[in-house]
Structure formats: C-alpha cells, structure tokens
Amino acid sequence: MSTVASLVVGRDGSTSKDKSSNGVSSDADRKAFLARRRKVDCILIGGNTARHEPYKQSPVPLVIVSRSTINPVVGNDLSHLWNMSPADALAKAKSQFGVRILVEAGTSIIFELIDQGLIDQLELSVTPVTGGDDPIDWQALLNRFENHTHTNVDGTDFYIARN
C-alpha cells in the first residue's frame, strides 16, 4: 500500500447527509475505516472534511490541505495545516511521515489526485443508504481503475480498485 483513497457512498451515490459522511456510513464501513487507519503513516484530508468530520483526534499525523490559515481541528497535536495543492501535500507528507498515505478527503481532492495518477488504490464502501447529498456516479469511479474486487459485509459492498 502506498497512496490509498477511501470513500463511502450510499447506494444512490450520496457522499454525505447533513454535511457529514457519517450519514451514509454503516457499522461495517466504520469497522473497515478504523482498521484501514491503523496501517498508514499519515492521513490527508481537505479543509471542508476537517470542518465537517470528527478529526479532533487521529492515530497518525493528519495533513489538512486548505487555503485557510485557521486550523479547524485545534487540539489535535498531530494535525498539520498546509496551504498547497493536494499533489504537493501528498509528496510532502510522503517525505515527512512515510509512504503509506490514506486520503480521506472529499470527492474533489480524491478525483483530482486520481486524475493526476497519484492514487494507487481506491477503497470504496457502498452502503444501503439513499437520499443523501452530493451524489456521484460510483460505478463510473470504479471504472476509472483497471482491476477491482468486491465483497459484501452485512449489506455494505466493499470495492478495492487498483490500476
């Protein structure tokens, strides 16, 4: 594992409910999410993710890519606020913290890094939830990768996609 992007969506492609991915998550997704974080050197997120998701604590260094000068996760001693492109932040994170980077950002940062060929693996959870906000075509997202595997745990579909 080098650079892995993690994303949860509802069955209809919803990426959030009430501005948080927790609304489209499931128990099985949450377990996979926590296990995934134990295997990385650093987590990279965007400013919006930092403002709307619970990042007051992180098990490893947390890089927040944002144009703001205000750290949205004050109190997280492992957080780093970097005003630079996601690609530059990814390169800097690898040099400072190690090569195993987990991108837990929103779709705009994840899609940008995929477009630049900087995501080695996508771990996509598709839950039974519908009726959320900001939908994406998750099947088209999977099709951007050459290979993918699928498992189902308690109604949540897990896809691992690689090029």
Residue ranges and their predicted role:
Residues 1-163:
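Enzymes that bind and transform nitrogen-containing heteroaromatic metabolites
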